[in-house]
A protein has these predicted regions:
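Active-site core segments that coordinate phosphate-bearing ligands/cofactors
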Residues: 1-4, 9-30, 52-320
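Active-site-proximal helix-loop elements at catalytic-domain edges
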Residues: 35-40
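Short beta-strand to alpha-helix junction loop
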Residues: 18, 43-47
Length: 320
């Protein structure tokens, strides 16, 4: 079966996201006919069964259903229960995303956020920064020469009081700047700056970068009070605390650490008829095991820091 799902197809300019189909207008402009393109399915729809010869090789029956599935971030959102209206998930992987589900289609006219079809049958807004947990890996492994991230973070004491800023643009930046030439930098060091200050600045810089996308969503009238979190970086209790207070959001930690894989399995379960829809299976399977609450005093400190952070990129942009 030659097919794709709506969440992955949303990344192509040939796709009409609002109507969840190939755009006739864009196809005509590009000289493409729709029969050249993959069939479009909802992420939870059954598209066929495993081929007989492959099923035999794998020791399966020839009636194993195959669902369309979803792109990585959409699948992660399903796996963290970020479905329905007004739910949020932050992913701290190599790159970082803030993913907000919505029952209505909306567009940021400044193109700071992506507007895509979601795997749950609705839509989502997404901000994506190109370097998130990869900033922490680069700092620890390439610069400090260690893989003991926890030991480096153990020396961080005074949250919200660090005088060092870090711009997390190691590979340019997507949301919200859309600038391939943006570059990372540390700003504000002095003779008093410590190794822990620099490590803290990296964690905070990524959190500030994600908040840039959250602020765009807020400017569109979207109000979020809490978020799920996933990805390798989310295993750090300190980073979770920083994000909760930089964003002023409750941060929910879920039981499963395999958001995208779990999301794919959940979509398959809906496709096989085990559950009626994605929202139902998310309510059944996704379990919150911890919640990080923002602390008013720390939120106030980080608010002041963030307002300074957001002036840095426009100021240094001409240097890149």
């Amino acid at each position: 079966v030659f097919c794709t799902d709506v969440s992955d197809a949303s990344g192509m300019l040939l796709f009409d996201v609002k109507n969840r189909c190939w755009s006739k207008e864009m196809c005509e402009i590009c000289g493409i006919t729709e029969d050249m393109l993959a069939g479009i399915y909802e992420s939870y729809e059954k598209v066929g069964c495993v081929k007989e010869d492959l099923a035999k090789e794998l020791g399966l029956t020839d009636h194993v259903a195959v669902a369309a599935g979803a792109g990585d971030n959409a699948a992660a959102a399903v796996g963290t229960g970020t479905v329905g209206d007004g739910r949020c998930n932050i992913s701290l992987g190599t790159s970082g995303t803030i993913f907000i589900s919505s029952e209505k289609f909306g567009v940021d006219k400044h193109n700071a956020l992506h507007s895509f079809a979601h795997a749950d049958g609705h839509y989502h807004l997404m901000g994506c920064m190109l370097s998130a947990a990869s900033c922490n890996k680069w700092w620890n492994e390439e610069i400090l020469g260690t893989k003991d991230y926890a030991a480096e973070q153990a020396d961080i004491k005074n949250l919200g009081e660090n005088r060092v800023f870090y711009l997390p643009y190691l590979m340019g930046e997507r949301s919200p700047h859309n600038d391939p030439d943006a570059r990372a930098m540390f700003i504000g060091m002095s003779m008093d700056t410590t190794r822990a200050d620099m490590t803290q600045a990296v964690l905070e810089g990524v959190a500030f970068g994600l908040r840039d996308s959250l602020e765009v969503a807020r400017s569109l009238g979207i109000q979020i009070a809490r978020t799920k979190i996933c990805g390798g970086g989310a295993k750090s209790p300190l980073w979770r605390k920083i994000i909760a207070n930089v964003m002023n959001l409750k941060v929910d930690v879920i039981e499963s650490e395999e958001g995208p894989a779990l999301g794919g399995a959940m979509l398959a379960a809906v496709g096989c008829g085990e559950y009626p829809d994605v929202e139902t299976i998310a309510e059944k399977l996704v379990k919150v095991v911890d919640t990080v609450e923002p602390e008013p005093e720390l939120v106030a400190k980080y608010e002041e820091r963030y307002q300074k952070f957001r002036t840095l990129y426009p100021t240094v942009k001409g240097l890149f």
